[in-house]
Amino acid sequence: MDAKRTPPPPTPPNPNPSVIGSGAAADGGGFGRGEAAAATKHMLAFHFLRALSRIHRATPVTRRTRTIRRAAYSSMARAASPRRAWSRALLGQARARRSRTLMRRAAVLVRRRVVAAPAPSPASARGVRIIAAGETSAAARAVPPPPRQQGEPPRADALRRLVPGGAGMEYSSLLEETADYLRSLRAQVQLMQGLVDLFSYQ
């Protein structure tokens, strides 16, 4: 057969960062910032490669590109600290997408299996529409920005829209979240560039 088998997912990295290598112990500095960054990159690579291993080659290119982009952001959020608002926001978006996908698949199965069913009464159908509309409007409702602090630049609201989970965040916390989000984005870009370089030489 010409079809290539999907490679198995990579081995998960060591969950205990204090024993990653012997460099930190030899230096006597304990688990420093450099080791923490290395552990985060290891976790990012693990989650991203595991997500890539689940993508089928027969998937259309446009859908595959969208899946890879979502996998990159989800793996970045899983590798980050769960205390970060941006990582929780990205993981929440991923869970919501999975829920919508499962609901659509369940609806398709129900339509296929139901051969003949009595039509719902107008009252029950109207109630279903009201509930669905309420859920949609509640989910789409934006979080209002907090009161502007003294010295806060006018473009802070634009930054709140760019950083996941930044809506409604006060300015000092927003700056901290932005810095951590940018560090993770930089690590993600380095990982993907390394993968491109690796496969370009094969």
Curated annotation (Swiss-Prot):
Domain bHLH: 136-185
Biased composition (Pro residues): 1-16
Signal peptide feature range: none
TM region positions: none
GO BP annotations, alphabetical order: brassinosteroid mediated signaling pathway; regulation of DNA-templated transcription; unidimensional cell growth
Keywords linked to the UniProt accession: Brassinosteroid signaling pathway, Growth regulation, Transcription, Transcription regulation
Region (Disordered): 1-33
Top-level lineage group: Eukaryota
Similarity section: Belongs to the bHLH protein family.
Annotated function: Atypical and probable non DNA-binding bHLH transcription factor that acts as a negative regulator of cell elongation and plant development. Binds the transcription factor ILI1 and forms a heterodimer of antagonistic bHLH transcription factors that function downstream of BZR1 to mediate brassinosteroid regulation of cell elongation and lamina inclination.
Record note on quaternary structure: Interacts with ILI1.
Protein name: Transcription factor IBH1
Species assigned in the record: Oryza sativa subsp. indica (Rice)
